[in-house]
């Protein structure tokens, strides 16, 4: 008999003793956790789901009949992805959709119940993922390291906690960080062509003439989904991801953690105006430089054509990038006082 436990947007179950192998917990009513509960009701789809609790997240399925060994490995990989985000960003999302205090990732039975292949709250916990029953689980049975991009991408939606300090790059952040997870966890990337295209994009851009703000923001004539180069995909989020992958490979893990720490120190700006988009882009450059403890103008200004004014160049020329306590927010304040 199914046992139901329901409470607003969080659900609490009687926790089983910790063991090496994960087993599904008692059924719970997902209706209060669903992103679009009316759609479930209209389609007359049962909202009972079963949680597979890991150390970091709870993965929900419509049946508890899956192989515990396969599910243990899969949930373990999702745990590692979540931990990777925590390690680098240094800040957890606001707890929203949860089971026993753990962020929920729900395997929905129909993509029309949500917003597509995957859906995630921005800055708060809660992910819905499609295709688990039709393909993902079958692939996991063959190779437990075959984790679809969408899980790590949607975690990036949850972990975008920067607000308008960096909102020009909300989607680009998720695209970039999914590859950080894939590389860090050494899982299988079944779309190598897309990864190769993204890796090459920043080098191709560097050799071209398209300006920085038109390439990396949406406030200078091109929409988010328009390709910036002749190859595809090279839309705005991809270009940011390509640039960040280049910086990460060049500067390393400690740099990336420091980079996000510095992003949090920045002031907020509108992302839909030319001035605001430029200010957010300036913050990107400064945060990257402070994290590197050196001026990255050679990359951002010379190679990527960021429009740094002569006055800004002069001010930054006097900065001791290794100064203790220096952060990107303080530099922005210094530049805006000029």
What name fits each language-model region?
Residues 15-20:
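Boundary at the C-terminal end of the N-terminal hydrophobic targeting segment
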Residues 21-47:
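Long, contiguous juxta-domain segments that are non-catalytic but functionally important
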Residues 23-24, 273-338:
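Beta/coil-rich, acidic/histidine-enriched accessory regions frequently appended to metallopeptidases
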Residues 46-158, 162:
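Juxtacatalytic substrate-recognition/specificity segment
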Residues 87-107, 161-170, 188-194, 255-262, ...:
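Surface-exposed patches in mature extracellular/periplasmic domains of secreted proteins
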């Amino acid at each position: 008999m199914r046992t139901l436990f329901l409470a607003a947007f969080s659900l609490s179950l009687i926790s089983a003793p910790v063991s090496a192998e994960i087993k599904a917990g008692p059924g719970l009513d997902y209706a209060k956790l669903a992103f679009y509960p009316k759609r479930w009701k209209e389609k007359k789809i049962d909202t009972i789901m079963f949680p597979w609790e890991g150390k970091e997240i709870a993965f929900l399925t419509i049946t508890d009949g899956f192989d515990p060994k396969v599910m243990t490995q899969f949930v373990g990989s999702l745990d590692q992805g979540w931990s990777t985000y925590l390690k680098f960003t240094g800040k957890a999302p606001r707890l929203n959709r949860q089971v026993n205090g753990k962020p929920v990732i729900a395997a929905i039975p129909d993509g029309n119940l949500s917003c597509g292949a995957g859906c995630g709250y921005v800055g708060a916990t809660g992910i819905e993922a499609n295709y688990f029953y039709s393909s993902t689980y079958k692939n996991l049975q063959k190779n437990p390291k075959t984790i679809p991009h969408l899980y790590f991408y949607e975690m990036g939606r949850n972990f975008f906690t920067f607000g308008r300090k960096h909102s020009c790059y909300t989607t680009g952040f998720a695209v970039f960080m999914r590859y950080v997870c894939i590389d860090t966890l050494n899982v299988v990337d079944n779309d190598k062509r897309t990864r190769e295209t993204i890796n090459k994009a920043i080098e191709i851009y560097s050799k071209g003439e398209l300006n920085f703000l038109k390439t990396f923001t949406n406030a200078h004539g091109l929409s988010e989904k328009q390709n910036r180069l002749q190859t595809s995909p090279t839309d705005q989020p991809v270009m940011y991801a390509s640039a960040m992958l280049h910086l990460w490979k060049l500067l390393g893990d400690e740099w990336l953690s420091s980079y996000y720490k510095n992003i949090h120190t920045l002031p907020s700006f509108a992302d839909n105006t030319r001035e605001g988009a430029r200010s957010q882009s300036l913050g990107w450059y400064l945060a990257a430089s402070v994290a590197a403890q050196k001026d990255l103008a050679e990359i951002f200004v010379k190679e990527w054509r960021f429009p740094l004014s002569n006055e800004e160049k002069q001010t930054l020329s006097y900065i001791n990038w290794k100064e203790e306590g220096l952060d990107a927010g303080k530099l922005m304040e210094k530049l805006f006082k000029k």
